[in-house]
Amino acid sequence: SDVHGNITALNAVLNDIKNRNINKIICLGDSILKCTHPDLVIDKLREVCDVVLMGNCDYAICRPEVKDRKFWTRHLIGEERSQYLLSLPKSYEFHMSGHLIRLFHASPYSLDEVYNPMFSNKNNLKGDSEITNPDRLFENTEFIGKTQNDPTPDIVGFGHIHTPFIVRHKNKTIFNPGSVGIPVEMLNCDENDTCNKFSTLSSYIIIEGVYNSTQLDSISFQLVRVPYNIQKEIIDLENSNLPTKER
């Protein structure tokens, strides 16, 4: 999830995935914005992912009402990629080892409403509205095309907050793979740049089980952290004409 135009980090994660012989890849949105290669990231995700979901940044830059604004990212990715991002689904679900797993970018209510079990003012960097009751993550909503007659998930996964975690809630599971492109530890470095060697590790989650099976079987979750050449991405950023690169 949350590659945010960081092609260097994406390639490192995809290489790790390849080495583990993982056979299905799902991206939870926010392919673009913040880093310098949104075009390459979109193309790579289209090539390797089985499913790509829409994120709030994808929608914000590509929505029709801002088409005429001179957004750097939208100009770079072009109209065809913009339309592709707008066509992405808001959720995806499947059975694995007898569990119904539902995925979305932020919540079943919107692209930017957040739940964070480790929530603090420091973590809420975007000022998004907060979900305080995790039960809401399992609800069927019109936003994701569900009715009250549809089955509710046993497991939900989402991105957006760049904070990797796996937690249990009332015999159900909530997980967040963190961010490939901008790990939360990097965002939380203080003004004195007191980061450590783990601050720039990309993250993703592996779910292992019997895909598309409604029969109860073993299932596991593994959080993976992957180093990448951040200096290359910094050089690309410094050499770009990205208006917000000083941030």
Listing of model-derived features with the role each one plays in the protein:
Residues 4-9, 33-36, 57-63, 109-111, ...:
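Active-site environment of divalent metal-dependent phosphoester hydrolases
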Residues 1, 25-30, 51-56, 104, ...:
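Active-site neighborhood of phospho(di)ester-bond hydrolases with catalytic His/Asp-centered motifs
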Residues 127-172:
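Hydrophobic, aromatic-enriched interface-forming segments
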Residues 90-98, 167-169, 207:
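Short acidic-hydrophobic surface loop/beta-edge motif
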Residues 167-247:
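Acidic, His/Gly-rich catalytic cores of divalent-metal-dependent hydrolytic chemistry
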Residues 106-142, 183-184:
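Active-site-proximal loop/helix segment associated with metal-binding centers of metalloenzymes
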